[in-house]
Amino acid sequence: MTDPALARVLAILSGVAGADRVPREAGADTPLGENGYWLDSVDMLEVILACEHEFDISLADPDELTEEALASAGSLAALIARKLA
């Protein structure tokens, strides 16, 4: 894993999901919902807030927080990378 944003996002996801919900092979393609981290809407809010704090960015624009952007660890990391650019 060479993407530092992805590494930090994966750490946040692991913290929010808890050890019992972290997939064994978690990576960029791991879904945030079903068949992945199994995050619900409250968990997703916690992830978004943690990412805002960790990366010192705002993720408040509903046009950015699309279903596609929140589909996987990698898509969330890509959104964050765009915000940091």
Residue ranges and their predicted role:
Residues 1-39, 43-85:
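Phosphopantetheine-dependent thiolation modules in NRPS/PKS and related acyl-activating systems
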